[in-house]
Amino acid sequence: MAVKRRRLLEKLLERRSRGRLHFTLIDPDKTGPGEAGEIAARAAEAGSDAILVGGSIGVTFEETDGVVKAAKRSGLPVILFPGGHTNASRHADAVLFLTVMNSDNPYYIVQAQILGAPLALKLGLEAIPTSYIIVGYGGAAGFVARARPIPYEKPELAALHALAGAMMGGRIIYLEAGSGAPKPVPPEAVAASRKLVDAAGYGGEVLLTVGGGVRTPEAARMLAEAGADVLVTGTLAEESPGKLADVVEAFKSA
């Protein structure tokens, strides 16, 4: 089966031209299909635009597939957010085909992509080139990927990684503080990344995405005002579903 070519990406870019986007992340290692279906339904009601499915540790094909199928019932597009080439499902709409820009491990820079490319082709998944940049806390993603997280107080380093990611073909530039991070990616890092990416002429072609550590409407609003196109939250949907709609609204209305 041929790989789907940018159909979902083009829809997301078109939707971004009308307003900011929010994605809800579900980790199959922590969430079974039953709960995943409930989280996805709540996310749709709260105004989320897509569901990301993936995790950094010990996720199997079967776990991923079950969660993807459950999340699809929400009516939202489901995008794989793989921690490795085993995080796959033919029922997903697309996969973030990501490179960890600040990893010291060749596996996460290119080897996982080589292993994952034929699988994406076989499953007919749309591959969305994604430059993944781990900032500050980093969480499990930073540890597993052997990343050198960008220090919170060095926004210019985040911006250089974002610019390089765009120049290397990334269509999603993802600044990640890590699941359960004590604080989000600094707005200064988002603003600096936005400025460089736009100056290089990639502004309308990429989605500057931020995730990790966002728990309040105020934090979401600050990231929006700094220039983020997409906000990703995961822990919030699992632990504080009542706050999700407020965070989504704050991000989209800023």
UniProtKB/Swiss-Prot annotation:
Needed cofactors: Mg(2+)
Pfam families per UniProt: PcrB (PF01884)
Signal peptide: none
Pathway(s) annotated for this protein in UniProt: Membrane lipid metabolism; glycerophospholipid metabolism
Source domain of life: Archaea
Subcellular localization(s) per the UniProt record: Cytoplasm
Keyword terms: Cytoplasm, Lipid biosynthesis, Lipid metabolism, Magnesium, Metal-binding, Phospholipid biosynthesis, Phospholipid metabolism, Transferase
InterPro entries tied to this protein: GGGP/HepGP_synthase_I (IPR039074), GGGP/HepGP_synthase_sf (IPR038597), GGGP_HepGP_synthase (IPR008205), GGGP_synth (IPR010946)
Binding sites annotated in the UniProt record for sn-glycerol 1-phosphate: Y174, L175, E176, A177, G178, S179, G180, G212, G213, G234, T235
One GO BP annotation of this record: glycerophospholipid biosynthetic process
Catalytic activity: sn-glycerol 1-phosphate + (2E,6E,10E)-geranylgeranyl diphosphate = sn-3-O-(geranylgeranyl)glycerol 1-phosphate + diphosphate
Molecular function, one GO term: magnesium ion binding
Major place of residence: cytoplasm
Family recorded in the similarity comment: Belongs to the GGGP/HepGP synthase family. Group II subfamily.
HAMAP family per UniProt: GGGP_HepGP_synthase (MF_00112)
Chain's role: Prenyltransferase that catalyzes the transfer of the geranylgeranyl moiety of geranylgeranyl diphosphate (GGPP) to the C3 hydroxyl of sn-glycerol-1-phosphate (G1P). This reaction is the first ether-bond-formation step in the biosynthesis of archaeal membrane lipids.
Subunit structure: Homohexamer.
Name used for this protein in its record: Geranylgeranylglyceryl phosphate synthase
Native source species: Aeropyrum pernix (strain ATCC 700893 / DSM 11879 / JCM 9820 / NBRC 100138 / K1)
Taxonomic lineage from the root: Archaea, Thermoproteota, Thermoprotei, Desulfurococcales, Desulfurococcaceae
